[in-house]
UniProtKB/Swiss-Prot annotation:
Keyword tags: Cell membrane, Ion channel, Ion transport, Membrane, Metal-binding, Sodium, Transmembrane, Transmembrane helix, Transport
Family the UniProt entry places it in: Belongs to the fluoride channel Fluc/FEX (TC 1.A.43) family.
Its membrane topology: Multi-pass membrane protein
Activity regulation information from UniProt: Na(+) is not transported, but it plays an essential structural role and its presence is essential for fluoride channel function.
InterPro entries the record matches: FluC
Natural source organism: Staphylococcus saprophyticus subsp. saprophyticus (strain ATCC 15305 / DSM 20229 / NCIMB 8711 / NCTC 7292 / S-41)
Protein name: Fluoride-specific ion channel FluC 1
Lineage: Bacteria, Bacillati, Bacillota, Bacilli, Bacillales
TM ranges: 1-21, 29-49, 95-115
Pfam families in the cross-refs: CRCB
One GO CC term, this protein: plasma membrane
Catalytic activity, as annotated: fluoride(in) = fluoride(out)
Coiled coil stretches, renumbered: none
Listed GO biological process terms: cellular detoxification of fluoride
Residues the entry annotates as binding Na(+): G71, T74
């Protein structure tokens, strides 16, 4: 029961952070590529890898921080909807391909780098 509460609280925090970062970025910059989601997924993937690599044996780290906060922060449902928008917008196929490669490739590498730091 405690773990469910930790995941719920962490997920709420992560989702609020994601929404805030996205809103602030979009107010300051005008770009057709959804850069905030890319940055959030890369940083979140790095943090997840870092915590995994540290092999922390603290009971609340995984449910609250990794699954909760970082899981709520790095949402691939947002990524999927952005990819559909790019794919279904005329003349955006190149951005669709670029964004797909950046999201999956760079997020994976960031997670791997975080893991191997420890």
């Amino acid at each position: 029961m405690i773990q469910c509460i930790l995941v719920m609280l962490g997920g709420g925090i992560g989702a609020v952070i994601r929404g805030f970062v996205t809103d602030v970025f979009n107010q300051k910059f005008n770009t057709s590529l959804p850069i905030p989601t890319l940055l959030i997924n890369v940083v979140g993937s790095f943090c997840i890898g870092l915590l995994m690599g540290m092999c922390l044996n603290i009971n609340w780290i995984n449910p609250f921080i990794i699954v909760g906060i970082l899981g709520g922060l790095t949402t691939f449902s947002t990524l999927s909807s952005e990819l559909v928008k790019l794919l279904t917008t005329p003349k955006q196929i190149n951005l669709f391909i670029l964004y797909s490669i950046l999201q999956y490739g760079v997020s994976f590498v960031a997670c791997l780098l975080g893991y191997y730091l420890f």
